[in-house]
């Protein structure tokens, strides 16, 4: 056993890993099997949660077959497509272990980059990662950069990649913050409220890979406008809460 592996085991006694999924029938088996390999090496108590957001393809059925083969895998189903934020909420709600990690079920991240983050949880409460050499089209890159800058400006945060789907949390955080967002703003709200509560956040870079199957969602104009509206609403809400706390 290597020194790093020993550190990783001491850093966590239990971890929940979940994957938000929408129409990922061609990716979810590979992503889950890779996670099982990585997590078994940690020799820790773990669970894997697949959150199927009302997929119109066979994602839900495939996820159930995976769970039937492995008792450490469970599936949460949305009857209809509720959106990314609601899918994250379902994952956090279903998680039962001391640490919670999530990454998307599209295979654009390598979950083997998660274990080196575990020793950081001795000093921090959240590890918020950022994409190295982001493998998306130019429009998504520009949208992501502008969104992150706007969020950081409004909430006074210094986060490099606010919506990077590779984050590790202490489970207790979700018992101590009230989340109002149900849409694309959930990542932002978690970090903003965690900072307000005094939780410690660190950041690390992770590699990002091209999508090899399925279709990206979430970048259409309707979703962007709705997220912008939610952002302003959340900013007003948290600013009002801060004024009450200071008075």
Name each model feature, range by range.
Residues 1-15, 154-157, 179-247:
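Hydrophobic helical membrane-anchoring modules
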Residues 52-61, 107:
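A conserved acidic beta->alpha catalytic loop
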Residues 78-94, 99, 108-184, 210-227, ...:
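Acceptor/aglycone-binding surface of glycosyltransferases and processive sugar-polymer synthases
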Residues 26-30, 57-66:
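Acidic helix N-cap motif at the loop->helix transition within catalytic regions
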Residues 13-15, 36-50, 58, 71-74:
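Short loop->beta transition adjacent to catalytic acidic/histidine clusters or analogous donor-positioning motifs
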């Amino acid at each position: 056993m290597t020194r790093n592996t020993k550190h990783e085991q001491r850093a966590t006694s239990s971890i929940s890993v979940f994957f938000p999924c929408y129409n990922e029938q061609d990716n979810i088996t590979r992503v889950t099997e890779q996670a099982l390999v990585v997590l078994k090496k940690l020799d820790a108590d773990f669970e894997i949660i697949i959150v199927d957001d009302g997929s119109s393809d066979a994602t839900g059925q495939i996820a159930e077959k995976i769970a039937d083969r492995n008792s450490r895998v469970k599936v949460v189903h949305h009857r209809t497509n509720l959106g990314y934020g609601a899918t994250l909420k379902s994952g956090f709600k279903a998680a039962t272990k001391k640490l919670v990690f999530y990454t998307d079920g599209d295979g654009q991240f390598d979950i083997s980059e998660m274990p080196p983050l575990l020793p950081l949880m001795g000093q921090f409460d959240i590890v918020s990662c950022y994409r190295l050499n982001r493998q998306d089209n130019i429009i998504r890159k520009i949208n992501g950069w502008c969104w992150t800058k706007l969020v950081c400006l409004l909430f006074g945060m210094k986060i490099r990649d606010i919506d990077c789907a590779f984050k590790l949390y202490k489970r207790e955080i979700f018992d101590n913050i009230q989340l109002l967002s149900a849409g694309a703003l959930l990542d932002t709200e978690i970090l903003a409220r965690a900072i307000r509560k005094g939780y410690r956040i660190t950041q690390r870079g992770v590699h990002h890979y091209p999508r090899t199957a399925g279709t990206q969602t979430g970048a259409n104009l309707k979703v962007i406008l709705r997220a912008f509206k939610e952002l302003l609403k959340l900013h007003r809400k948290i600013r009002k809460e801060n004024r009450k706390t200071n008075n």
